[in-house]
């Protein structure tokens, strides 16, 4: 008797499911890709309990014949390749014949399908990979696959599922990526009876982006295009002012397949050059058409890793396309647009309404003279709206938003304000080592800044400036050269840090509420973690599709920083699963000190230079900027005399050393 046996097919499928089906989103991905391969123009995904209870994918594609239906649950049975040569010219999303058998082996699956050539369709029901029912039924052309009780026979996998909201966010992300890859298909995603995503299927990629990321985001994206003999690159990239805190918004498509590729991500960032702030990433959708012979998708069961021949040439093509597109744009922000974005509003006294602050019990020290507290612009709440159906009070004036080509009219109340994300106003050249995304490095920086000891600064006499960058001063210890940007950065950092003080969680109502748009997956994740935002005084309410409304703001947040501040806090929460006023304010102090400091090649008059040195002398640590760079260097009198050889060396000792 041999010790080596051939595993039963059901067991082999369950083993394969460990690689193919990691979570409910994996099932959605495989079923939707099969629907796309079947040349569907409409695909509807319905889920219950984030896919753990039920996943149903309905399409209007080619369907399967009665004879092919049971074969679809056989491992390595496929209609997409027939010979070895086909493996090197794959244009379909699936080809292994593993997905459906793997899914069927760990769930109960029901398939209804019909082709247009026959008068009736077929029904198949299987549990744990074993077919229980196979019969003829009446059903429309296309395929409907229902997966129920996922992982019912693999409890270990079920145990490690994340929360329902987290799993739902993964599903939304998968559907969004596939809808970007195939704008010619109309996608609909419904969760527990509520529609989360819907695309038009017009074939216009820009329309698909608008449906996923929102109209305001799409308006700030540029078309790119480039090609050579092997590759054709097209898509949309965001202006440098529109960024996110992670790479999740960078979508790379190869022949209609969403892939992950570090080198191509690097090429995208290279295309932006120094226009992006360190730790920030653009919103990008790039479609790459390539000869299948140059791409190997048979690398991993999920098929998200693709190996590409001539990868360096493709990187150069992408970088050039992005850089050329950005060159054609005026990257200087529009002053009128910035004025419109300013949340500082002035009203005559009779129009102001003072409401009592709603105390939430945290300590507030008025002796700090907290400059974030304002006596401005508060009002009663606007009329309540039906958030899911967008019913607005008839007394509220509405105005039409600017429309994209072929898009439906978007109407919104003028009594709300669309929040804009913060723009990047300094680059890597200011601080190449500053990475606000690296929470460990940021924490170390903040700890170092908190533990700084008071230093004694020498008395300096300013006498000149070089190249609009360095200040010269003399003191009793010799010559001092000061980096003017680093000096003012230290001064302003300590100013903003001291102004932060203790915070109060009291709230002040907004005269004009703010609307905050997010992608579908981020919107769902934020809903799950909303209690953490509430702890720091940010109370967002659902307001329509992937949108929150803010009706009141914590008084520790300046009114003009509400839009950027709330987005920053939400990004922090999505990135680290926690929010901290202390960390946010410290980050803000560091960034504000850099952005509002004088730069290199800026000439100072004598009065300004002397005033800067006076302010620097009053700092707790005048010797380093917040990022750790030196503010000034010193040449002592002895150093100067050595450089000019006024101090003679001991010639005898040099002879003894064999130098003479």
UniProtKB/Swiss-Prot annotation:
Say if the entry is tagged with keyword DNA repair.
yes
* Residue numbers spanned by region Disordered: 414-433
The record's Gene Ontology biological-process terms are: mismatch repair
Query: By its UniProt entry, which CDD domains does this protein fall under?
Result: HATPase_MutL-MLH-PMS-like (cd16926), MutL_Trans (cd00782)
Keyword rRNA processing: yes or no? no
> Residues of the signal sequence?
none
This protein's source sits in the domain of life called Bacteria
GO molecular function terms noted in the UniProt entry = ATP binding; ATP hydrolysis activity; ATP-dependent DNA damage sensor activity; mismatched DNA binding
UniProt entry keywords in alphabetical sequence: DNA damage, DNA repair
Q: Cellular component terms, GO, for this chain's entry?
A: mismatch repair complex
Q: What does this protein do?
A: This protein is involved in the repair of mismatches in DNA. It is required for dam-dependent methyl-directed DNA mismatch repair. May act as a 'molecular matchmaker', a protein that promotes the formation of a stable complex between two or more DNA-binding proteins in an ATP-dependent manner without itself being part of a final effector complex.
The record's similarity note reads: Belongs to the DNA mismatch repair MutL/HexB family.
Instruction: Tell me which NCBIfam families the record gives.
Output: mutl (TIGR00585), PRK00095.1-3 (NF000950)
Identification of the protein by name: DNA mismatch repair protein MutL
Organism of origin? Streptococcus pyogenes serotype M6 (strain ATCC BAA-946 / MGAS10394)
């Amino acid at each position: 008797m041999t010790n080596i046996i051939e595993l039963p097919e059901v067991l082999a499928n369950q083993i394969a499911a460990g690689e193919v089906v990691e979570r409910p989103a994996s099932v959605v991905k495989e079923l939707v890709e099969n629907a796309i391969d079947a040349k569907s123009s409409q695909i509807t995904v319905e889920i219950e309990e984030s896919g753990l209870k039920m996943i149903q994918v309905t399409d209007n594609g080619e369907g399967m014949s009665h004879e092919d239906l049971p074969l679809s649950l056989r491992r390595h049975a496929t209609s997409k390749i027939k010979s070895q040569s086909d493996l090197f010219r794959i244009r379909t999303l699936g080809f292994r014949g593993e997905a459906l058998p793997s899914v069927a082996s760990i769930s109960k699956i029901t398939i209804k399908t019909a082709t247009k050539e026959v008068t009736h369709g077929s029904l198949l029901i299987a549990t744990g990979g074993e077919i229980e029912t196979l019969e003829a039924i009446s059903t429309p052309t296309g395929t409907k696959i229902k997966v129920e009780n996922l992982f019912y026979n693999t409890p270990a996998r079920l145990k490690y599922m994340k929360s329902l909201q987290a799993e739902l966010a993964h599903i939304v992300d998968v559907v969004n990526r596939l809808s970007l890859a195939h704008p010619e298909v109309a996608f609909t995603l419904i969760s527990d009876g509520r529609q989360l995503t819907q695309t038009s299927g017009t074939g216009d990629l820009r329309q698909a982006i608008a449906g996923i990321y929102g109209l305001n985001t799409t308006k700030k994206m540029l078309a790119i295009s480039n090609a050579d003999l092997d590759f054709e690159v097209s898509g949309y990239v965001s202006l440098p002012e529109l960024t996110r805190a992670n790479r999740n918004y960078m979508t790379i498509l190869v022949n209609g397949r969403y892939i992950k590729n570090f080198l191509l991500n690097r090429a995208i960032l290279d295309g932006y050059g120094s226009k992006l702030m360190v730790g920030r990433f653009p919103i990008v959708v790039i479609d790459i058409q390539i000869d299948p012979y140059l791409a190997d998708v048979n690398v991993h069961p999920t098929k998200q890793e693709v190996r590409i021949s001539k990868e360096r040439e493709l990187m150069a093509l992408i970088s050039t396309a992005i850089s050329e597109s950005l060159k054609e744009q005026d990257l200087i922000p529009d002053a009128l647009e910035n004025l419109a974005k300013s949340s500082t509003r002035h009203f005559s006294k009779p129009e102001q309404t003072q409401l009592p602050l709603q105390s939430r019990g945290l300590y507030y020290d008025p002796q700090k003279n907290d400059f974030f507290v304002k006596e401005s612009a508060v009002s009663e709440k606007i009329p309540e709206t039906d958030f899911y159906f967008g019913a607005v009070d008839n007394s509220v004036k509405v105005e039409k938003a600017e429309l994209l080509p072929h898009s439906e009219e978007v109407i919104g109340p003028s009594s709300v304000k669309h929040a804009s994300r913060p723009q990047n106003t300094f680059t890597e050249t200011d601080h190449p080592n500053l990475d606000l995304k690296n929470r460990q490095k940021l924490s170390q920086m903040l700890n170092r800044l908190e533990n700084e000891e008071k230093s004694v600064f020498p008395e300096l006499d300013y006498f000149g400036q070089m190249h609009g960058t360095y200040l010269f001063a003399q003191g009793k210890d010799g010559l001092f050269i000061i980096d003017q940007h680093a000096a003012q950065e230290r001064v302003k950092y300590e100013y903003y840090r001291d102004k932060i003080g203790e915070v109060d969680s009291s709230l002040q109502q907004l005269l004009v509420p703010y609307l905050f748009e997010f992608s579908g997956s981020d919107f769902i994740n934020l809903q799950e973690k909303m209690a953490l935002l509430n702890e720091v005084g940010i109370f967002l309410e659902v307001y329509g599709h992937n949108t929150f409304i803010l009706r009141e703001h914590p008084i520790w947040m300046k009114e003009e920083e509400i839009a950027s501040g709330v987005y920053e806090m939400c990004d922090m929460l999505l990135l680290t699963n926690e929010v901290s006023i202390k960390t946010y304010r410290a980050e803000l102090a560091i960034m504000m000190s850099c952005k509002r400091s004088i730069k290199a090649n800026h000439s100072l008059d004598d009065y300004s230079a002397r005033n800067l040195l006076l302010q620097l002398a009053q700092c707790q640590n005048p010797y380093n900027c917040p990022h750790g760079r030196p503010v000034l260097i010193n040449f002592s009198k002895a150093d100067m005399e050595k450089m000019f050889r006024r101090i003679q060396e001991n010639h005898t000792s040099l002879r003894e050393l064999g130098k003479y």
